[in-house]
A protein has these predicted regions:
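Transmembrane alpha-helix boundary and packing residues in multipass membrane permease domains
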Residues: 13-17, 26, 83, 95-99, ...
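Small-residue faces within membrane-embedded alpha-helices
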Residues: 5, 30-34, 75, 79, ...
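Generic hydrophobic transmembrane alpha-helix motif, especially the helices
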Residues: 1-31
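C-terminal transmembrane helix and the adjacent membrane-cytosol boundary/short C-terminal tail
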Residues: 82, 123-153
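Membrane-cytosol interface at the C-terminal ends of specific transmembrane alpha-helices
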Residues: 21-72, 78-87, 138-141
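Short, membrane-exposed interhelical loops at transmembrane-helix boundaries
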Residues: 104-114
């Protein structure tokens, strides 16, 4: 629970003391923050899934693995896929911010061009970040809608 409460930028600053200013620092911060959040979402999806299909598999002599495979997984898979796409969106947005503290990526480029007051390049980079983020948001939103629609079809 604690790891989910700590923003990725704070995680990156803590990791920075060990790994230095490298892209690995940013990737590790995103991974640590994402794993905690995604584990919670996975737990909640499985916990709130209807138990009827899994109980039916068990009643017909299925093993625990078969209960999960045929009873629980088909129910939670669309939600987990949707949540993974959402987390990917969050990671893309956060990676630009992490780059501002010097751990690589487009945020690192923004910092460099800002220091040299090359505002035209900064403007283009900001537009690129916004367009990429909006595109990922639109694409993953469409995929999530399809997944959810298929779940209820």
């Amino acid at each position: 629970a604690i790891i989910r409460a700590v923003p990725e930028i704070i995680i990156a600053i803590i990791i920075l003391t060990v790994t230095g200013l490298t892209p690995f620092t940013g990737a590790l911060a995103l991974a640590i923050g994402g794993i905690g959040t995604h584990a919670k979402w996975t737990y909640e999806a499985i916990e709130t899934a209807p138990t009827g299909p899994a109980e039916a598999v068990k009643a017909s002599g299925g093993t625990l693995a078969e209960m999960v495979r045929w009873g629980t997984w088909p129910i939670v898979q669309p939600e987990l896929a949707s949540l993974a796409l959402y987390r990917f969106e969050i990671n893309v947005r956060t990676s630009a911010v992490l780059g501002l503290i010097g751990v690589g990526g487009i945020g690192d480029m923004l910092t460099g061009y800002t220091q040299y007051r090359q505002w035209d390049v900064v403007g283009v980079l900001l537009i690129v970040v916004i367009v990429i983020t909006m595109s990922i948001d639109a694409i993953s939103g469409a995929i999530r809608r399809r997944i959810v629609a298929a779940k209820f079809a």
